[in-house]
Amino acid sequence: MSVPQETVNRIARELFEAKRDVHTVPYVSPQLPERDLDAAYAISAEFAALRERELGVKRVGRKVGLTNPLVQQRVGIDEPDYGVIHDDMVHASGTHLPLSRYNRLLIEAEVAFVLKSDILEATREAVEAAIDHVTPAFEVVDFRYDGSVGQIVDTIADNAGCSGVVLGEEQHPYGEVDLTKVEMVITGGGTEITRGVGSNVLEDPVNAVIWLAGTAIRTGEPLRAGEVLLSGSIGYIEPWPADVECVATITGLGRVVATANSKG
């Protein structure tokens, strides 16, 4: 990483305050060498650490994003990224999300994996053995930037856009459902928003977890028992419509429900 630590700390502080106070900041990419992913992840790590130190939140999971070629094409990025899920970011199905807490709320539906043991080896066998159950989930996506997503370093530095997760109503043992063949539909107030199939996510959502496990091991922060892991969007990422009930249904896994409220 060629970026001074004081620059990393300053940018992380700006993103932390933007999230806390709900305002936007300029892209970080002009301040970093082109495609310096190490610097972007260092900023993201300090951003997460600031939340943990100053707000007292705890890490309870991770997300891997940009696993769907539809989403990659939409944002002009060609590789996955990852971020952190803190305990104050986790919601139950049926939750109401105040839009006043977000800059520009976006909606995704995906398969969430919950671990029963640590993952210390990034193999399919080790990952599958560590999974306790799967459930449908919304990722609550929000960025701290003045414009749209920006470059990959902008996305990574901003916790990969992850601002929360809404977990589904049902829990299913891993292997009970063929995740490559599940079909997902999101509706808002009964109107279809997006749809997709499980194979959109790196051909199989568990492949996203394998990728995440390897990345986590390389960075010295392996995935731990109890963590919630978001595997990436099955359909497009779309604006979250206000004041209507949004429902994501994934065949064989059930549904997840949430409403973004313009008041309150």
What do these predicted ranges mean?
Residues 112, 209-210, 230-232:
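Active-site scaffold segments
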Residues 187-189, 231, 251:
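Short strand-turn-strand beta-turns centered on an Asx-Gly dipeptide
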Residues 2-204, 241, 245, 255-261:
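Catalytic-core "active-site belt" of small-molecule-metabolizing enzymes
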